[in-house]
């Protein structure tokens, strides 16, 4: 079991501990539960889906990286496939506040970058901030997404974001988590190709500036993040954050990164290079390359 889970795990009910122990035994537990695993946990504990998601939130929050706030938020995004995806907030010393990742963004990106097609619900241990409510409104589940909070009845996103402004106001038809492929040829080594593939999946209807980041760890594992724009612009999630979300949730740490590649267009209206390289250097990675989409 990864050390970060030990405290939260010890506080779970005995029957949930017993059912989870073989799942969490792997140090690199992928921070997700398949539909089959969810069903098994429900049978072992007698909990329904909502109660089980609440019970698991401390494990999601244990994935948080909060050196600034020490305020750990956990989220569980429930995919329509039946898979549940953990998420947690992340803060980066030496970078800027704007590079911060919120727990809801983490769980949603985890699902999206894992190939999930849509979300049915999201469970969070604290009420979503306005930034996250706006981020969620970019999803193809839209205002119907169910939000579950401890001690409250579940409500749709529309109840938390009345009179919402979103992609439909800008006549955007392709939404976040819809399948997208921008068709750039995969060239270069494996890490470059992973970055280009991530750029091909970008959701960037507003700037038309595709980008993707791929991180290679010392053991050869590669984590890729795609750019995810938002109708309100500021809640946009950069591609580096997508890759860092996966790296963190899968049990790796920043010193494990040995090389990074950013893929983007040289003449794009928005350029990720400066922010990406600055944040990576703050995390200790100086081996950073840029490949140009053509």
UniProtKB/Swiss-Prot annotation:
GO terms for biological process: cytidine deamination. Its cofactor is Zn(2+). InterPro entries: APOBEC/CMP_deaminase_Zn-bd (IPR016192), CMP_dCMP_dom (IPR002125), Cyd/dCyd_deaminase_Zn-bd (IPR013171), Cyt/Deoxycyt_deaminase (IPR050202), Cyt_deam_dimer (IPR006263), Cytidine_deaminase-like (IPR016193), Cytidine_deaminase_bacteria (IPR020797). Its EC number is 3.5.4.5. The active site is at 104 (proton donor). GO terms for molecular function: cytidine deaminase activity; identical protein binding; zinc ion binding. It catalyses: cytidine + H2O + H(+) = uridine + NH4(+); 2'-deoxycytidine + H2O + H(+) = 2'-deoxyuridine + NH4(+). It comes from the Bacteria. Zn(2+) binds at residues 102, 129, 132. This enzyme scavenges exogenous and endogenous cytidine and 2'-deoxycytidine for UMP synthesis. Belongs to the cytidine and deoxycytidylate deaminase family. This is Cytidine deaminase.
